[in-house]
Amino acid sequence: MLNFGASLQQASEGKMELISEKSKEGAHPWDKAEQSDFEAVEALMSMSCDWKSHFKKYLENRPVTPVSDTSEEDSLLPGTPDLQTVPAFCLTPPYSPSDFEPSQGSNLTAPAPPTGHFRSLSDAAKPPSIAPFKEEEKSPLAAPPLPKAQATSVIRHTADAQLCNHQSCPVKAASILNYQDNSFRRRTHINVEATRKNIPCAAVSPNRPKPEPSTAANGAEKAGTAPYDFAVPSSETVICRSSQPAPTSPVQKSVLMSSPTVSTGGVPPLPVICQMVPLPANNSLVTTVVPSSPPSQPPAVCSPVLFMGTQVPKGTVMFVVPQPVVQSPKPPVVSPNGTRLSPIAPAPGFSPSAARVTPQIDSSRVRSHICSHPGCGKTYFKSSHLKAHVRTHTGEKPFSCSWKGCERRFARSDELSRHRRTHTGEKKFACPMCDRRFMRSDHLTKHARRHLSAKKLPNWQMEVSKLNDIALPPATASAQ
């Protein structure tokens, strides 16, 4: 009985110790999981309060990490402390900013703001073991600032366009649209003032370590949410031209840059032309035309084309780059005298002579009969013609008239036949139009010319000629 009572007393004492330990643990304000949740909510509340006031300072002081790049969408985080409205995938890399480190001793992954901007309210309640971590976290801010290097992440922008939309991440999408709308209004106002003053949007001087402040450079920095830093070699100029923004899609912008070709032989290279091309969000196909002016000299290397924008479109981006046409200058046509000629008319002396087809000469029509009399060199086709010509030199007249009482002689037979017609009165050459007859063929030919010319004359001249023919016989009769 005594042993049983002792065992009951020991069991009751063990139960009391367990209850006291549970009461002590229950008296603690929060456990580790609840403490990490409170820290995450407190960090989000601090971010929403100090985000807008320290926006520019945050952009300047945030370091570059390989986890995420510094595009303009990194700075547009949700401004509400409610953790239930933000999905978990929007707070994990590559969606979370690069310098938001997870706090130690917490099982929940939550972005922590940079300690240089604010101090959390739970620093006094944290154990002393976390203090060295905070001191190490503050130490990188005292180091010299790293040079700016900014790029474009295809993975981030593609995932943002597909995952973080109004349904999945409404707070982030609303803040992005609101901030980009304000930046677009400032950009259009600055572009209008720049076009009025005929000042380029940005001028990059590669030889200076820090660009001097100017109105054009300040306007370019205010226009974009995140400035673009290009590594431009020496002796090059960057000229930005902004096209007319599309009224339907003021959110998305893009920069079209054509880099210059490599210059050889001391020739200054072509300028780098950047043009702002608006991209509509609803179109599945985006076509971009790269304007290029004909260079004075043919380029040796084809110039590459770079496409950059705030967000990569979902559709296909096509680059239509015109090929440079090299026109060989033609030398001006100069005549042998030294005068310039028009390229329309052919130059005299330079036109190729057309191959003329020479007709084959008949061997019977060659003037092979040459007169051998000194001082004469006439040629004839026939030997009979040469004999008749030689008679003119010798004076020989073998053909004599047989008419009674006529003793005339002739060197040629045709002359004798013509002379005989004068005795007989024969006129064997008749005109087919007026029936007039002639003794000689040459007389008929001369008469036929009158008929041909009469057809061309007007009627009044024909009448005058007829009157003259009528008036001539009385005059001749009176003269006789």
Curated annotation (Swiss-Prot):
One of its GO terms (biological process) is positive regulation of osteoclast differentiation. A zinc finger (C2H2-type) spans 369-393, 399-423, 429-451. Belongs to the Sp1 C2H2-type zinc-finger protein family. One of its GO terms (cellular component) is nucleus. This is Krueppel-like factor 10. It comes from Rattus norvegicus. Residues 1-12 have a biased composition (Polar residues). Keywords: Biological rhythms, DNA-binding, Metal-binding, Nucleus, Phosphoprotein, Repeat, Repressor, Transcription, Transcription regulation, Ubl conjugation, Zinc, Zinc-finger. It is found in: Nucleus. Transcriptional repressor which binds to the consensus sequence 5'-GGTGTG-3'. Regulates the circadian expression of genes involved in lipogenesis, gluconeogenesis, and glycolysis in the liver. Represses the expression of PCK2, a rate-limiting step enzyme of gluconeogenesis. May play a role in the cell cycle regulation. Plays a role in the regulation of the circadian clock; binds to the GC box sequence in the promoter of the core clock component ARTNL/BMAL1 and represses its transcriptional activity. GO terms for molecular function: core promoter sequence-specific DNA binding; DNA-binding transcription activator activity, RNA polymerase II-specific; DNA-binding transcription factor activity, RNA polymerase II-specific; RNA polymerase II cis-regulatory region sequence-specific DNA binding; sequence-specific double-stranded DNA binding; zinc ion binding. Disulfide bonds: none annotated. Residues 14-32 have a biased composition (Basic and acidic residues). Its main location: nucleus. Residues 1-32, 64-83, 97-146, 202-222 are annotated as: Disordered. The modification Phosphoserine is found at residues 183, 249. CDD domains: KLF10_N (cd21572).
